[in-house]
UniProtKB/Swiss-Prot annotation:
The gene is MATA1. GO terms for molecular function: DNA binding; DNA-binding transcription factor activity, RNA polymerase II-specific; transcription corepressor activity. This is Mating-type protein A1. It is found in: Nucleus. CDD domains: homeodomain.
Amino acid sequence: MDDICSMAENINRTLFNILGTEIDEINLNTNNLYNFIMESNLTKVEQHTLHKNISNNRLEIYHHIKKEKSPKGKSSISPQARAFLEQVFRRKQSLNSKEKEEVAKKCGITPLQVRVWFINKRMRSK
């Protein structure tokens, strides 16, 4: 049983060492640990104990990563950019991707922000 505890401790260390990595990499490492456990000479009870330990730690990692990501703040568009967008909208209510990029450069915002602004403006205009 001491071997299982030390193995679980090593697994814990491994899982917490990969906190800075992407979720896909955490899943890959966790799956590798699961495969290693399944191929080992451990009893079913020991395997189950280790699986449970890994699952609990992976949940903690997910929650930790989720907490670290700050919510996206609402980006504001300057009054000058808004006025320019209004002018463009009066001329044309829908833009293709090249036009969105050009407008975005002139406004100092991203093409995605232009796209969302136009979608919202069309919805408000109905």
